UniProtKB/Swiss-Prot annotation:
InterPro entries: NADH_UbQ_OxRdtase_chain4L/K, NUOK/Mnh_C1-like. The keyword rRNA-binding does not apply. GO terms for cellular component: NADH dehydrogenase complex; plasma membrane. This is NADH-quinone oxidoreductase subunit K. NDH-1 is composed of 14 different subunits. Subunits NuoA, H, J, K, L, M, N constitute the membrane sector of the complex. GO terms for biological process: ATP synthesis coupled electron transport. HAMAP family: NDH1_NuoK (MF_01456). It is an enzyme of class 7 (translocase). The gene is nuoK. The chain crosses the membrane at residues 8-28, 35-55, 66-86. It is found in: Cell inner membrane. It is a multi-pass membrane protein. Its EC number is 7.1.1.-. It comes from Flavobacterium johnsoniae (strain ATCC 17061 / DSM 2064 / JCM 8514 / BCRC 14874 / CCUG 350202 / NBRC 14942 / NCIMB 11054 / UW101) (Cytophaga johnsonae).
Length: 106
């Protein structure tokens, strides 16, 4: 990976990470479907993970890659819990639109 990083350059990884993060922010702010919002959050997390891997490779340190491994495990658990909640909400309400979720009362 070090050779590829030297050939491509860390600036391109930073640019790609920023673009992915902005796409995720756009999806969170402007979409009304809960599944699309979850996917956008995952895109944002993957953008940060890409940046961690690029910086850890650039500095020849494996701590960033280890952190990404644990971050991906937590993200997988987050998706499992989030989708289970969405399935439960869909069974009760019949919709997963964020506008319809505002009517839920605790």
């Amino acid at each position: 990976m070090g050779n590829i990083l030297n050939q491509i350059g860390i600036e391109n990884y930073i640019f790609l990470s920023v673009v992915l993060f902005c796409i995720g922010v756009f999806g969170v702010l402007y979409r009304r479907n809960s599944i699309i919002v979850f996917m956008s959050i995952e895109i944002m997390l993957n953008a940060v993970n890409l940046l961690f891997v690029a910086f850890s490779t650039y500095h020849q340190d494996a701590q960033g890659q280890v952190f990404v491994f644990f971050s991906m495990a937590v993200a997988a658990a987050e998706v499992a819990v989030g989708l289970a909640i969405l399935v439960s909400i869909f069974r009760n309400i019949g919709s997963i639109s964020i506008d319809n979720l505002k009517n839920l009362k605790g």
